[in-house]
């Protein structure tokens, strides 16, 4: 049975494993550090290492599952017009030009770079289709 707390879930899984292997009272105590928990289990070293890797992956999975993502925000209309106008004049920008355009548009230089790369790809695809 899985709960909301991944550490508690891991503890329950370890308890189930130990019940099938041998009895160990360590897990019945309130131990929240899974490394300490696994180190004190009376199992072969390889089994402990595999359990540690699994526990680590499980905790990462739980953290990713509960992560909130920010939604993508479209470029401002003013920025898009400026980018299109600049692209019609010049398809490749220098680092300095990217920075100046980003400041003018109120976006990051990375957004300018990606926008230009995407626009070049779209232009190439449209030309190849014709």
UniProtKB/Swiss-Prot annotation:
Residues 68-127 bind DNA. It holds the Pfam family Homeodomain. One of its GO terms (cellular component) is nucleus. It is found in: Nucleus. Keywords: DNA-binding, Homeobox, Nucleus, Transcription, Transcription regulation. It comes from the Eukaryota. InterPro entries: HD (IPR001356), Homeobox_CS (IPR017970), Homeodomain-like_sf (IPR009057). GO terms for molecular function: DNA binding; DNA-binding transcription factor activity, RNA polymerase II-specific. The keyword Protein biosynthesis does not apply. Mating type proteins are sequence specific DNA-binding proteins that act as master switches in yeast differentiation by controlling gene expression in a cell type-specific fashion. Belongs to the MATA1 family. There are three genetic loci for mating type genes in C.glabrata. MTL1 seems to be the expression locus that determines the mating type of the cell, whereas MTL2 (containing MTL2A1) and MTL3 (containing MTL3ALPHA1 and MTL3ALPHA2) appear to represent silenced repositories of mating type information. Haploid C.glabrata strains can switch mating type, however, neither mating nor diploid forms of C.glabrata have been observed so far. This is Mating-type-like protein A1.
């Amino acid at each position: 049975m899985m709960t909301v707390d991944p550490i508690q879930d891991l503890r329950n899984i370890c308890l189930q494993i130990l019940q099938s292997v041998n009895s160990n009272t360590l897990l019945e105590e309130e131990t929240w550090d899974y490394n300490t928990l696994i180190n004190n289990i009376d199992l072969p070293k390889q089994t402990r290492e595999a359990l540690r890797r699994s526990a680590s992956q499980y905790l990462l999975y739980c953290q990713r599952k509960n992560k909130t993502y920010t939604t993508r925000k479209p470029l401002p209309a003013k920025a898009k017009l400026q980018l299109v106008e600049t692209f019609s004049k010049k398809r490749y920008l220098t680092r300095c030009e990217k920075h100046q355009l980003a400041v003018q548009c109120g976006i990051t230089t990375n957004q300018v770079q990606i926008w230009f790369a995407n626009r070049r790809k779209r232009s190439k695809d449209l030309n190849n289709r014709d």
